[in-house]
Amino acid sequence: MTTESTTGADAAQKPARPRRKKQRKPQGQWAVDGREPLNDDERIKQEDPGFSVMQRIRDIYSKEGFDSIPAEDLAPRFKWVGMYTQRKQGLDGEKTSTLTNAELQDNYFMMRIRLDGGVVSSAGLRTIGEISEKHARNTADFTDRQNVQLHWIRIEDVPTIWDELAKVGLDSFFGCGDVPRVILGSPVAGIAKDEIIDGRPAIEKIKKELLPDPEFGN
């Protein structure tokens, strides 16, 4: 028997190496992957559903004031109910990159009100105007995402503002952060002569059925 034939026989008997299974890249979402979250926002959602902060705002923070709010509620959970802390006035622009969040933020909020589909009733606009006068120093910014932003909001006033908005079918939920901030639509839906399809029923269904669902909110 030659060396070549022996080598060939050994090679034939050697089992093939099993193929390694390719690991699926984690998405960083604990509810999707069932793995450790990749960032703090996902970790915080794992510990407590995002919208749970609403009740704490009503029961605790609006009564005990800004200083009672823990950091992990202030960001990101407040974002998910439509509020950012405002930046302090008069800060040197060159120094802002070196300051901490606590040094940058003021004890007031910007609240973003959703206008899904770019549609709002006259009663809704009137309510926003009244809230602006009473609680937001007459501020109201219309954004290119079809939302309205109010500034200088005190935590003590937030429950009252939410209640007034709810009376006219408006809210601030999912207004800020990496969330579906608004459902864009045409403000002339149902009116434009060249319209192919009126998207308002779909927008309304998404707003009522999907957005409040905790399975999607978290």
Describe each PLM feature range.
Residues 1-109:
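Iron-sulfur (Fe-S) cluster-binding modules
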Residues 2-7, 108-218:
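Small-residue-enriched alpha-helical segments and adjacent helix-cap loops
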